[in-house]
Amino acid sequence: MVRLLRYGTIFGPLKDRWRYLYKRDLYKRRLEAGPEPERFRSALINWNYDAELYACTHRFGEKLNIESLRNAMTDASFLKQIVKQRTEAGLAATDQTTLAFTHNQELAKQGKQIAEDFLQKALHYWYPKFPQEGIEAITKFLLSESTIADISSGLGFKTLIRCDIPSPRPTMLTNALFAFIGSINENTGRSRAEVFVADFILTHLVGKDINEIWQVKNPMGLLTKVLEENGRQAPESRLIWATGVSSVLSTYVVGVYSNKEFLGKSAGATVSIAEEMAARDALRRLFETDEKRAQIPFDKLYKKGLLLDK
Amino acid sequence: MAFNKAQQLATFSRVWYLFDAKWQCPHMSGERIARILRGEHKPIYYPGESTGDCVIAINTRHVALRNDAWRSEALHIKREYAKTRYDIPLFKLHELDPTKVLHLCVLSCMPSDSIRRYDMARLYTFPDDAVPVHLIKNVCDQIRGSRVIPKRLDDLTPNDTKTFPQMFKWPKELVLDDLDRDKFVRVVPPEEIPKREVMLGQRAGKQNYWFHVPTSRHEEVKIN
Amino acid sequence: MFISIGKAEINISTTFNVRANYPVRKFVHDNVHHDMEVQQLYTKVNNLVNDKFHQRLFAVIKIGDEQRKVTTEDIICKVDEFHPTIGDRIRFEKVLLVGSSDFTVVGRPILNPHFVRVEGIVIEKTLSQTQMEYWYAPRKKKVGARNYLWKDPLTMIRITNIELLGPIPGTNQSSSR
Amino acid sequence: MSQFLRRITSLPIQSIRSFHSFDEVTPAKYISTRLKNGVGSRYVCQLQRLTIQVCKEFRTSFGTRDWIANDLIKFAREHPYVVVYVQPRRHRAPNLVGEYLAGDRQWIPLSNCDREKVNWWIHSLLTQKGDPQWRLLKQMHTDSPSVQGIWTPFTNKPIDRITRTYPDKDLTEMEYPQITATQQIQELFEQQKLNKTS
């Protein structure tokens, strides 16, 4: 099979000169004009907001009525925009008719409160030995704006939220998700809302390590404090292994013991790093949050009936 | 530092071994050292990756070879140019460089691919116990020998020979060798010792000892 | 059956280690079933089994004649045809091995379904990348070379649950006797 | 609808030139899901919107027209979580655009596909995550790779190594020395003595 050698460009093999020049010109114009301005998804033809909301109610298996979902999805900036448009259109502020829908601030507050309580309860139930500051740090991380913004954009709220700019800002995304939780709470009840939080916010911890989310500044100090509370002696660190001490790839394995009982060990490039990591490992084993810990039973939290009574 | 980083450091750490080659067979210990240098003793071994460990071999001067391997085995260096074809017997090589014998054994046990050079660079051989301090500090484990260290005859105490059980009785009329050979020793005058004629050409590499060293075939070495 | 506790391995079916040409110390002497020490082992392992909260279990599963080591919350990919669609929950029958950080139970060849339950849910069914196979037959006039393109259907399954439903089979009878 | 085996796929624009056959160089990814899908108690279908552009007259969209006439209602009722838009475009080729929750879009031309194949493509969009056609670097994905602890060179080593000073005397012998001939003879001798005395 003889293949002709032809000139080629990113547009494919060069067949006609005029076509190549035409395409090159188009390409240059495009670069001058710059990227297309961002547009609202609702500006396109194939867009029907009611159908989208209807689908959204069915997507997560929550039975919501469309109106509450519409409220959850409208942002304060959207209302401001409407009022501004009306004043420009000459309507006085007084006789502007009240809108059928309201913005989602209150629902967001409700939702955030529900999520916070539930997360504290769930984490405290599954990691009883974990200190309170750690649980607060984890809930703060889970309810932080960036995490919640990722979650809500992953749930498809990016196009559903009604706001003044095409792509909603993280604050709008977080308000929308919390408002969604609030609307679930209104429609079907708190337990259903908590199951939603468990399924989408708590599962964010799946790939993450609890002990790294809660950054402990001085692990050895915390370890001594914890051991005193348990009535054990202060921790001592011993060198268990040292290979290649004078070489570049040096490895020290340091173990932490209290009264000759093993607490934890870890490796490090230098003795100080190894000791610090050993202290963290000891903390991890004391709080029982290391790898061999079972995973959080996201769907069985209620079946175990442990959260209801609290 | 994250837990998984500490775990990775521990898993891929380079362990330093010490090997006491006194009385050990270089071939058998060479296999073990080659395996450790390549890292095949680790479950995380992967041919592309260099997961090998470092080995410090000491006392290579006191390596033990089987039978008359010192005399009969030789290091064959074949080069295309003339006069560089050498057959150095191991005892001569040992005089030149006491660490070379073990080094060559490990080299032969390694598969001859491109990373062999780098794996061999992780082998440190020392003729005696004298090891630099910064190397002996790195050591964290020791490779065990591959053979039972025999007891030399002159180490035997008379008590051992007495307590050793008598297997059978010598017949009465047996005569042990009672010939006193020192009487028949004759000091060879220097002029009688055959001089080494300088031979060029094909024999040059082979003819450098006054006794015949059949490197290829196994023959009795005639020492006069 | 072979139960290994941490470092000490109890080889119930004692076999002489053929490979080692030196006398291997027997870990467990022959009439082992009713010995007191092994009873404690059985009870200890069964207690570990009941303690569901703190033990992350892992299992070795055979799916589409491939064996996979799975824990909960991890995703395995089955290559060829797989009937269940997205959202279907599956229970894996061929479980070869179950274990946690303290014990490992090895089935010969598979474990009793009443003892172990491994469940998963189908997350995604996609097509793999376009794979090409090049075929060349010399001295053929019409078609000497052929490119054969295809895409395999892939199924992603997330393991949702690994549970031990009862004490280890074979250990409770001997303790009750 | 179950996805039966489709090994030979006549991809609409599958020309050899566009196919990149060097395995190492093709773009590859690890397995991942959106938002830990499937971990909690529910599974969220990732397809949000489905737009079908069809021409009422042209022969190329005959399959698409059949599908819309016969299967569209059943499909919409079965999957209420997917919004389906049908766009009649005069004298244009039929297309299928799937928009996913995370914002990805997938475009599949349906020209000359019959009703069964259109149905197959729609269900392949339905069950996808949004970005197919990646080479998988690994066939599985785990967040907790090891439960019993990852091997380190120190796991199976006795702990007293750090206390020893090297070169160590008792570490030079063989671990399981074979019984030499002299030891066997001495053992036989002791046994003989024992038998004689007992």
Task: Please state what every model-predicted region is.
Chain A
Residues 1-310:
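Double-stranded RNA-binding/processing signature
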